[in-house]
Amino acid sequence: MAKQRSTPDSSKVPPRPSTARSKPAAGRRPPSRTAANRRRQQRRLAIIGSGVAVVVIAVLVIVGVTSGSGSGSGSSQLTPVSAAELAQVTSVPTSTLVAAAGAAPGGTVSPPTNLPATTPTLTSASKPEIVYMGAEYCPYCAAERWPLVMALSKFGTFHNLSSTKSSSTDVNPNTPTFSFYGSSYTSPYLTFTPVELENRLGKPLQKPTAAQNQLINTYDAPPYTQGSGGSIPFVDLGGKFLISGTEYDGSALSNKSFTSAVGYMTSASNPTSRAAEAVAGHLIGTICSLTNDQPASVCSTVPASLKTGQAAAANQGSSSGG
């Protein structure tokens, strides 16, 4: 499957190779974007500068106001996810996700890529660490969060998740999704560290650490990624596996409400939900390889074939200018 990627702000990270968005599933090119939106999509990743604290505070105020105001599609709206909605997503059985991964037609999903054996392991608090970097405006990040929540919930518990939607002016506009901003995750088996770089309006949210910047500058680029790299979503799984770009086509989610999307993505009755569940199954397998097959209640149901990623050479998504 050709990976789908968004590219953040170039003014906020040391120079990296120019980016190119991969074609979406079935070889469809994204619709043409306005010049202003294209410039925003080409912006880079890190948020630097002495004025960042002031900007972030301003953004937090904006988010707090709009999340309670019921503003229209142009607002940066965060809404707490209800316990019932979260339970519906996280309670999809492991066996269902694993079976979906095994049954997924070729080309519909793209499993994590293996990093070289010499890559330093990524740990935090003496546990394997998974680092996610994305942005709320990014439609491909929006799609990727669904299987991430499904898979990670088998190893731990999310707290204070919010719902949001991707930019209204990007491809796949208003894709409903979770936001990891302001959330936390607890697990005895692994550490999950999410960084939401910008909100759906493209305003800064979280500043990556120097170590996180080094990760994405090193591994979100050739030879580890197809094309010129520099894309989000970016996920480093324990220094062993890599995701750069979404792993399936989530375009059918565009303009759905979050509540509608919860039902749609857990129904296993449409190609999008089946693909997302397959991605979650692959994620569970690779995470089990990081946690030494713990917990056994989860990992004992996962075949060995899902506990390895795909070879880097298999990451052959055709790239095109966007």
Locations of the language-model features?
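Short active-site neighborhood of thiol/selenol oxidoreductases, capturing the structured segment around
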Residues: 124-139, 148-150
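Non-globular targeting/processing and membrane-anchoring segments
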Residues: 2-129, 143, 153-322
